[in-house]
């Protein structure tokens, strides 16, 4: 029997909370996206994240954890071999990526591939060299990501096939190539994405609302802008408070991230980090820490368990619904 009628999963894209044990293998040493932002800025105006337990989970600067947090919180390790957006999101919904996606950083894409692409689309390709994706072109609000189709079925497919709503906000639809999505909303910014989520919260549906807020990553993490990142977290917190007020008693809110992107670290790439897991419902009997988990996939498995849906064959993860 389901515990929650609607589940909102909000991905604060790149808000990692400290280096994983294997982070050095990915070229990341002593990385900590949220911790280093707090260290540099000392304080952030984030009352809602604070009362949910974010600072109990990971504190720094002059910030203080909540005396009585109202959320259930822990950190999740990434089981997959990677630190990119698709790998992180796919793992949340049950897919473990063993082999990292191939990149073409040394010599660009093969000439024959570019020639075929130009032939098919009738346009010339520019760039084709290793460069920061936030520097070589202007990031516009209408930017569109072209991702690979997931390598297997996910929790999203299972939910949709069971007749449940799977509503995506932001680039979630792109990340999953529309697989398992019943309705998609594209966002012009992370603030807009939260406004869309608040609007969705006021409507009736049964199932999942899956949200990606990309500005943390695209505008501030990749560009190594600590202040911008911190201010983006503060903007999010304001809308988080509005959303929390509108949640129904049988709603569940989950906040998490897909990887790190430490704005104090060298280069412009993502960083291999633990991510937060913060769950909240008005029907919860108190908050506090729960056991650390070794995969992001507990998210998808927990959602499926809540709705009595079987996870697709070949997926990973286990439910922690009883902890929530």
Write out the residue ranges for each language-model feature.
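Feature captures the catalytic ectodomains and active-site-proximal regions of enzymes
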Residues: 1-324
């Amino acid at each position: 029997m389901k515990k929650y009628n609607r589940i909102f999963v909000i991905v604060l894209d790149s808000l990692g909370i400290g280096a994983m044990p294997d982070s050095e293998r990915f070229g990341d040493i002593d990385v900590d996206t949220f911790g280093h932002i707090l260290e540099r800025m000392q304080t952030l105006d984030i009352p809602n994240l604070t009362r949910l337990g974010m600072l109990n989970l990971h504190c720094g600067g002059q910030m203080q954890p909540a005396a009585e947090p109202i959320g259930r919180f822990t950190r999740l390790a990434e089981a997959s071999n990677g630190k990119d957006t698709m790998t992180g999101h796919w793992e949340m919904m049950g897919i473990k990526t063993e082999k990292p996606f191939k990149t073409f950083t040394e010599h660009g894409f093969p000439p024959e591939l570019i020639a075929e692409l130009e032939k098919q689309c009738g346009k010339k390709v520019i760039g084709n060299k290793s460069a920061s994706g936030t520097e070589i072109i202007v990031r516009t609000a209408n930017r569109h990501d072209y991702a690979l189709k997931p390598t297997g079925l996910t929790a999203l497919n299972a939910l949709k096939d069971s007749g449940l709503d799977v509503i995506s906000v932001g680039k979630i639809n792109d990340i999953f190539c529309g697989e398992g999505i019943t309705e998609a909303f594209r966002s012009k910014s992370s603030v807009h994405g939260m406004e869309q989520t608040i609007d969705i919260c006021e409507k009736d549906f049964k199932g999942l609302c899956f949200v990606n807020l990309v500005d943390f990553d695209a505008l501030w993490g990749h560009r190594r802008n600590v202040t911008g990142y911190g201010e983006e977290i503060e903007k999010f917190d304001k809308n988080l408070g509005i959303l929390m007020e509108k949640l129904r008693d049988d709603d569940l809110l989950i906040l998490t991230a897909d990887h790190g992107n430490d704005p104090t670290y060298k280069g412009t790439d993502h960083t291999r980090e633990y991510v937060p897991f913060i769950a909240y419902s008005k029907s919860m009997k108190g908050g506090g820490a729960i056991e650390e988990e070794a995969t992001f996939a507990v998210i998808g498995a927990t959602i499926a368990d809540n709705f009595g849906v079987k996870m697709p064959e070949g997926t990973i993860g286990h439910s922690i619904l009883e902890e929530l």
